[in-house]
């Protein structure tokens, strides 16, 4: 609820309406009482009879001034002149101030309820924000863990591929070196450039037959036994 110039205007309008309504009722009541009093006065004047045996009122009798007739006259005078308007307006003003204070108090209670509701909404939003931050941190942690696992898997795959390629190269090299008699497009291997004595006779190579007379050992005997040429020479 807005408390400001608009609320003040509304309060002033309500105050004026209340005062006018009460003043109107007061004037109507005053008019009715005046009519009744005037009628009563006229009736008393026509019906009043003198009392010849009545004693005159003494001047020192203080209670005589406060007789009911005098009090009624004072009341009639006050009603005729409106001497009590100030007191009535003060009473009305007091009632208006009380009603205005009550309205302000009600507005303050409404504003307090609104503020309490907004504070509760802020607390709910804060709790939701904290929960969202926790969920985001958990997702970030899981993402980092998954990224580390992918890195390890990629490293393992690359290492396995390199190891497999190395194994393939090694197997191919071993197969060519030890299984194939011909290497490098039909050319002889470097370590086969020179003829090596074998157990089979080689007719393509003319060798000088040498006799190791000084080393007549078992190896020479074995060579002589296995080689027919050495056997004929011996």
From Swiss-Prot:
Subcellular location: Nucleus; Cytoplasm, Cytoskeleton, Microtubule organizing center, Spindle pole body
Example of a GO biological process term: spindle pole body duplication
Region span, Disordered: 38-57
Primary location class: nucleus
A GO cellular component entry from the record: central plaque of spindle pole body
Domain of life: Eukaryota
Protein name from the UniProt record: Spindle pole component 29
Native source species: Candida glabrata (strain ATCC 2001 / BCRC 20586 / JCM 3761 / NBRC 0622 / NRRL Y-65 / CBS 138)
């Amino acid at each position: 609820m807005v408390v400001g110039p608009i609320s003040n205007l509304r309060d002033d309008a309500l105050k004026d309406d209340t005062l006018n309504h009460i003043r109107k009722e007061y004037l109507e009541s005053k008019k009715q009482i005046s009519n009744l009093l005037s009628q009563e006065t006229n009736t008393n004047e026509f019906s009043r009879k003198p009392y010849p045996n009545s004693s005159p009122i003494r001047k020192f009798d203080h209670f005589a001034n406060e007789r009911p007739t005098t009090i009624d006259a004072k009341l009639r005078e006050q009603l005729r002149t409106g001497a009590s308007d100030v007191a009535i307006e003060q009473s009305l003003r007091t009632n208006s101030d009380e009603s205005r204070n009550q309205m302000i108090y009600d507005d303050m209670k409404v504003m307090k309820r609104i503020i309490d509701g907004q504070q509760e909404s802020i607390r709910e939003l804060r709790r939701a924000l904290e929960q969202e931050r926790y969920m985001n941190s958990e997702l970030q942690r899981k993402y980092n863990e998954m990224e580390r696992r992918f890195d390890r898997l990629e490293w393992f795959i690359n290492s396995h591929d390199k190891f497999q390629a190395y194994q393939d190269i090694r197997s191919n090299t071993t197969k060519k070196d030890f299984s194939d008699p011909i290497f490098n497009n039909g050319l002889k291997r470097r370590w086969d450039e020179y003829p090596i004595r074998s157990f089979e006779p080689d007719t393509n190579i003319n060798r000088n037959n040498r006799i190791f007379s000084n080393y007549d050992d078992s190896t020479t005997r074995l060579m002589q036994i296995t080689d027919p040429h050495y056997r004929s020479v011996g």
